[in-house]
C-alpha cells in the first residue's frame, strides 16, 4: 500500500494514514522464488512460502500460522500502547486477505476487518498454491465457517481481482461472482443483523481494489468520513531501502525455518512421550544397572495399548475413507509363463471408481489342495508390478519371480504413486478431507488381502509384505494397519523419517526434491518409523539397507531401527526383528530377507541352501 507505481487509490496504507490511522505493516513470508545455489533444490522449483510450508506441515505447523502470529504480534503492540477505547482494524489483500481473515477469527481484539482479493468457496482449495494446503480444511472450516468466527465483529469483504499466481503447485485466479456470493451467504451468525458486507460492482463483476465504497464503509466503522486530501509517500527514503527490504524478507524465512528445525531436533522426545513412554512409562527413567541380564516382560499390555495407536495412525495420520469394500469381482488374464511359474494380471473392485490391480505369480510345482504362503512384492515410485517380476532391473532384481521359484506364491500390486504430479494432486485433494495417498492404497491392499485369502492354494494366515523404495514406505504404513499381513520387510526406505522429510541440513532430505506430497500433517510429532513399526509388534519385521543407498544414511537408519529392536527384545522376541546391511545401493539384495521369509513363513529354502 506504499509501493511506488501503484495508482493512488490502491495505496491503501497512504489512504489510511491520511485519515489519521496509526499503521503497522507486518512483513510476511514471500511467495517469491526461493533463491538457492543448491542444484537439487533449484530443480524442486519452490517459493519461499513452499519452503516453509513443506517442513512446517510435517511438524504440525503452517506457513499461514507463522504469518498470523506476526499479525497477532502487531495487535499485541497496539493493545499495549493505545488507549483501551481505541479500535483496532485490519486490512489485507490476496495472501494478506487470507491472513487477515484467519487472524480476525482467532483474536477478538480485532474490531474491524477488511479483506480484498481473497474470499471464495473452499471447495476447490486443493487447486490453490501448495502453501495454502490445510489438513482437513474442507471438512469443517471453509472460508464461510472461518468468517463466522469473526462475528459479531465487523467483516468487510471486497470482491476484487485476485492476484494472478501460476506454477506454485497450484494456481490463483479471480473466481466467478456466483462462487464468492454463495460462500458469503453461507456465513452463519445467530443474529440476522450480523455486521458483514460484500462489495462487488453493480454488474456483479470484481470491483476495483480498495474501491471508494469499500473504503468508506471501513472508515464508517471508526466513525470517520473520507477526507478530501491525500498523503504522498515515497516508498522509502533510505538509500539502502531495497537491501533492507530484501533482508527483512530473508529474515522472515530464516526465523520460521529456525523454529521448525528446532522442532525437528526435539521431535524424538515428543514422539517417545506420545507413544512408547505413554504405554510403558516405567521405561522412560530406568535405573542404572550392572546386571548381566534383565527379566523379559509380558507383551499383552503393550499389544492391547498399541491397538488404539493403530487406530490413530490409520484415521488421523494416514486417513481412512468411511466406505465399505465392494465385492472384489476379480478379473484375471495370463500375461507371462516360464518353466517354473505362471503370471496373471488381476483387477479387483474396491470402491466406486477405485480399483486395485496387480500381477499374481503361481509356482507350477504345487500339489493338489496345498496351501502356500504368499509374499506381496511392492514396487516403488513410478514402477509397475512387472518391474518386480521380469523386467530385469538392478533395483528389483526380479525378486517376485525369484521368490516364486523358491515355492512362494507372489503377488505384485500396483500402487498409485506413478505419473509424478498426477498422484501428488490426488494426495493434495485427499488432504482437504483428512486423507492422503495412502488412504487409497490401504483400501486397495485391504481388498487384495481379502481376495488372496479366498484362493484355494493360499494360506491366508501366511501373507507377507516386501517392498522397495516407495514400496518400502508402504511396508511401514500398510502392514502396521492391516494385521492380515503376518510380517513386513522394508527395503531401500527405512529411515529417521522426520529428518528425511523436514530437515534442511541433511543431504538425503525431501526438502531438496520434487516430492512435495511427502509432508504428512504433524507426523513428526507422532509417528516416525520406529513408532510405525511398533504397530507391527509382535509380527516379524525386517529392514534391508544398502550402504550406498542415497535414500538415507546408515547412522540414521541404525538409530531408528535400534528403537524397534529394543522393543522386541524387552518382550523376548528379538528373533522376530532383523536388519541386513549390504555393500550395495537402492536395490533388493535378496539374501537375508529371503532367509527371513523362509523362517517366518515356515517354508523350506531350496535344497542347495540347506
Where are these regions (language model features)?
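Cap/lid segment of the alpha/beta-hydrolase catalytic domain
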Residues: 1-79, 93, 120-129, 367-454, ...
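Alpha-helix capping and helix-loop boundary segments enriched in small/acidic/polar residues
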Residues: 3-7, 42-47, 58-69, 91, ...
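Alpha/beta-hydrolase-fold serine-hydrolase catalytic core, especially in secreted/extracellular enzymes
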Residues: 4, 18-22, 54-63, 108, ...
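Beta-sheet entry/capping signal
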Residues: 20-24, 87-89, 111-113, 153-156, ...
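Alpha/beta-hydrolase-fold catalytic nucleophile elbow
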Residues: 27, 91, 116-117, 158, ...
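Short, flexible loop/turn elements at secondary-structure junctions
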Residues: 30, 94, 348-352, 362-365, ...
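Accessory cap/linker subdomain of secreted extracellular hydrolases
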Residues: 33-74, 177-181, 190, 264-269, ...
Amino acid at each position: 500500500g506504499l509501493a511506488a507505481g501503484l495508482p493512488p487509490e490502491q495505496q491503501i496504507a497512504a489512504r489510511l494514514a491520511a485519515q489519521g490511522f496509526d499503521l503497522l505493516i507486518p512483513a510476511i513470508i514471500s511467495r517469491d522464488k526461493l533463491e538457492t545455489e543448491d542444484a537439487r533444490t533449484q530443480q524442486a522449483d519452490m517459493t519461499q512460502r513452499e519452503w516453509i510450508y513443506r517442513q512446517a506441515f510435517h511438524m504440525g505447523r503452517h506457513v499461514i500460522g507463522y504469518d498470523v502470529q506476526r499479525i497477532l504480534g502487531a495487535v499485541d503492540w497496539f493493545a499495549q500502547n493505545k488507549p483501551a477505547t481505541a479500535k483496532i482494524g485490519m486490512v489485507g489483500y490476496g495472501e494478506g486477505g487470507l491472513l487477515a481473515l484467519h487472524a480476525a477469527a482467532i483474536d477478538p481484539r480485532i474490531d474491524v476487518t477488511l479483506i480484498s482479493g481473497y474470499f471464495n468457496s473452499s471447495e476447490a482449495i486443493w487447486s490453490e498454491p501448495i502453501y495454502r494446503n490445510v489438513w482437513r480444511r474442507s471438512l469443517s472450516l471453509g472460508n464461510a465457517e472461518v468468517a463466522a468466527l469473526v462475528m459479531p465483529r465487523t467483516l468487510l469483504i471486497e470482491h476484487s481481482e485476485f492476484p494472478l499466481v501460476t506454477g506454485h503447485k497450484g494456481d490463483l485466479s479471480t473466481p466467478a461472482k456466483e462462487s464468492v456470493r454463495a460462500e458469503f451467504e453461507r456465513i452463519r451468525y445467530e443474529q440476522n443483523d450480523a455486521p458483514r458486507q460484500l462489495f462487488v460492482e453493480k454488474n456483479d463483476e470484481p470491483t476495483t481494489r480498495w474501491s471508494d465504497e469499500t473504503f468508506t464503509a471501513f472508515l464508517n466503522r471508526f466513525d470517520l468520513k473520507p477526507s478530501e486530501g491525500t498523503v504522498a509517500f515515497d516508498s522509502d527514503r533510505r538509500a539502502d531501502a531495497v537491501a533492507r527490504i530484501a533482508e527483512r524478507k530473508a529474515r522472515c524465512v530464516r526465523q520460521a525455518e529456525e523454529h521448525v528445525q528446532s522442532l525437528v531436533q526435539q521431535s524424538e522426545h515428543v514422539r517417545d512421550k506420545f507413544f512408547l513412554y505413554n504405554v510403558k512409562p516405567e521405561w522412560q527413567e530406568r535405573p542404572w544397572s550392572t546386571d548381566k541380564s534383565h527379566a523379559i516382560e509380558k507383551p499383552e499390555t503393550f499389544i492391547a495399548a498399541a491397538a488404539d495407536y493403530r487406530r490413530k495412525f490409520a484415521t488421523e495420520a494416514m486417513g481412512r475413507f468411511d466406505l465399505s469394500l465392494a465385492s472384489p469381482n476379480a478379473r484375471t488374464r495370463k500375461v507371462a509363463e516360464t518353466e517354473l511359474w505362471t503370471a496373471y494380471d488381476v483387477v479387483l473392485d474396491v470402491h466406486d471408481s477405485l480399483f486395485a490391480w496387480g500381477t499374481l505369480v503361481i509356482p507350477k510345482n504345487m500339489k493338489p489342495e496345498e496351501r502356500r504362503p504368499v509374499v506381496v512384492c511392492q514396487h516403488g515410485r513410478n514402477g509397475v508390478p512387472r518391474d518386480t517380476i521380469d523386467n530385469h532391473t538392478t533395483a528389483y532384481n526380479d525378486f517376485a519371480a525369484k521368490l516364486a521359484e523358491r515355492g512362494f506364491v507372489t503377488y505384485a500390486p500396483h500402487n498409485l504413486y506413478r505419473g509424478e504430479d498426477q498422484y501428488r494432486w490426488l494426495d493434495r485433494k485427499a488432504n482437504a478431507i483428512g486423507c492422503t495417498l495412502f488412504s487409497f492404497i490401504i483400501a486397495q491392499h485391504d481388498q487384495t488381502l481379502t481376495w488372496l485369502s479366498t484362493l484355494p492354494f493360499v494360506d491366508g494366515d501366511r501373507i507377507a509384505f516386501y517392498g522397495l523404495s516407495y514400496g518400502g514406505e508402504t511396508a511401514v504404513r500398510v502392514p502396521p494397519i492391516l494385521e492380515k499381513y503376518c510380517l513386513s520387510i522394508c527395503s531401500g526406505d527405512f529411515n529417521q523419517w522426520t529428518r528425511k522429510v523436514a530437515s534442511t541440513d541433511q543431504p538425503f532430505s525431501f526438502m531438496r526434491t520434487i516430492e512435495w506430497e511427502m509432508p504428512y500433517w504433524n507426523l513428526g510429532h507422532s509417528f516416525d518409523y520406529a513408532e510405525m513399526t511398533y504397530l507391527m509388534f509382535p509380527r516379524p519385521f525386517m529392514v534391508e539397507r544398502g550402504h550406498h543407498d542415497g535414500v538415507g544414511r546408515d547412522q540414521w537408519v541404525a538409530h531408528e531401527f535400534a528403537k524397534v529392536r529394543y522393543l522386541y527384545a524387552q518382550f523376548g522376541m528379538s528373533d522376530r526383528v532383523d536388519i541386513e546391511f549390504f555393500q550395495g545401493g537402492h536395490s533388493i539384495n535378496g539374501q537375508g530377507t529371503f532367509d527371513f521369509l523362509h523362517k517366518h513363513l515356515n517354508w523350506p529354502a531350496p535344497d542347495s541352501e540347506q
